[in-house]
Amino acid sequence: DSRIEQAQGLLSEMEDLDARISPLLARLADWVASLDANALQEVSNEAREHLGPLLRLQDRAIHQMSEAEEGLYAELGTTGSSAWGRLQSDITSQLSVEVHLPSGTKSMPIAAVRGLATDNDLAVRKAAYEAEMQAWPTVAVACAAAMNSIKGEANTVNKRRQWKAPIDASLYSNSVSTATFTAMQSAISASLPDFRRWMRVKAQLHGDTNGLSWWNLF
């Protein structure tokens, strides 16, 4: 619950502690890279069992700033992208809107309204959709500012870390290789015609004449 001040305070403390770890990880990555991860695995069975993390640290060393810069970025991040992210999360989690349900108008938190998207009653699903369309624009400016600030910070840091493209940094963060990502994208593209046919059939079953309505999507 984002309204619990004690929880918010503890989260801030955790973020400060996490920021202290960043320069230490940068130092560890440089150390692993200087010794070579493949050579380190020969030191012991334990090292060999952790070759994967060692290789990731070695790759990280290629794409990181100096230890001091990484430490400064981590500290600034607590009042930068992290703060913007929490603002967006707090605003959206505390958002409420009136939903004109068949049983009467009811004020509901946006998360509960989102849950009505799978209700069996068409009238309920449509009422929930219309309520969402009324609610989200009221926080659009704040959410856009938060997302732009987070993305802007990421783009700046990724350049300093010498990533060729933002997608490369994202793939590394998620432990996904370029080959795997390409294969996933190809699989999605190949399945889109079948997916579109399924959407058209579902629209017909619901009686939609101009494409599948959002409230019938789920």
What label would you give each PLM region?
Residues D1-F218:
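A well-structured
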